[in-house]
A protein has these predicted regions:
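Generic beta-strand structural signal
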Residues: 66-68, 89-91, 98, 169, ...
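Sec-dependent N-terminal signal peptides
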Residues: 5-14
């Protein structure tokens, strides 16, 4: 009788763990779905301000166009004037950088820094945590006013920018904080998402604040890190012409 009770308890624990894991995977899928625009195009204007540890700063303004259903995006630099016309084109697994001065395309990686800031080219896309990562650990934690589920995730594909990440997900399934780690566990950068804006039935961050833990300066006992602030404005779901997601578009827009 005692053995039957123990066996039943073990069975219950296993079943409960399986259901819990399934629920967390579904939660990650819901997180991804809220920021992915499969049924329409998405466009927006990005203002990216990088502040170096020495206090100097630089600003980039870019127009972004996404078609998630076809895994495509175009990013066109509008400012500064010296970089105006520089652009990125993503078509599936292929990503090109267009140089308006040399009038040529080169293959590049979504892992690269955008305009030498802490913002990566991959940050222009929606998230795919459920498809690119496995769950190592889950816990509940308070983050300011938000009650969050904290996921420790490890990549199952080499295409992601960071092999390990930790995300704080609030009860509305929006990511409020993100920590990116190297494979060895070194903290690379921390991102905060203080506000979102609703676009149709989905959400786009209104502001992202990124702290780069690899670029810093020590002043006495204080450490100053590189800090990048991203403001996303004028999001639109207007359908863009198919010709926009092509090399010809980036070439043509630079002749105007």
């Amino acid at each position: 009788m005692k053995r039957r009770i123990i066996a039943a308890l073990l069975f219950f624990c296993v079943i409960s763990a399986v259901y819990a894991e399934t629920d967390y995977v579904k939660m990650l899928k819901d997180v991804d779905e809220l920021v992915t625009f499969k049924g329409t195009d998405l466009s927006a204007e990005y203002t990216i301000v990088k502040r170096d540890p020495d206090g100097s700063s630089s600003t980039t303004v870019a127009a972004m166009f996404r078609r998630d259903s076809e895994d495509k995006f175009v990013v066109l630099v509008l400012q500064p004037v010296a970089d105006k016309g520089k652009g990125y084109l993503k078509q599936g697994n292929n990503l090109w950088l267009y140089d308006p001065i040399g009038k040529g395309f080169t293959f590049t990686s979504a892992k690269e820094r955008f305009q030498n800031s802490s913002f990566r080219v991959s940050d222009f896309t929606g998230s795919n945590y459920a498809g690119n990562y496995k769950i190592n650990n889950v816990k509940q934690e308070k983050l300011g006013k938000f009650s969050c589920t904290v996921f420790d995730l490890e990549a199952i594909t080499k295409s992601v920018s960071f092999p390990k990440v930790k995300i704080w997900v609030s009860e509305d399934n929006l990511v409020r904080k993100l920590e990116d780690y190297s494979l060895s566990g070194q903290l690379m950068r921390t991102s905060a998402f203080p506000s979102y804006q609703k676009v149709g039935k989905r959400w786009v961050p209104a502001k992202i604040i990124i702290q780069d833990h690899l670029v810093f300066r020590k002043v006495g006992d204080k450490v100053e890190y590189e800090r990048t602030t991203v403001d996303i404005k004028n999001p639109s779901l207007n359908k863009q012409p198919d010709s926009l997601y092509t090399k010809e578009y980036l070439e043509r827009v630079n002749t105007k």
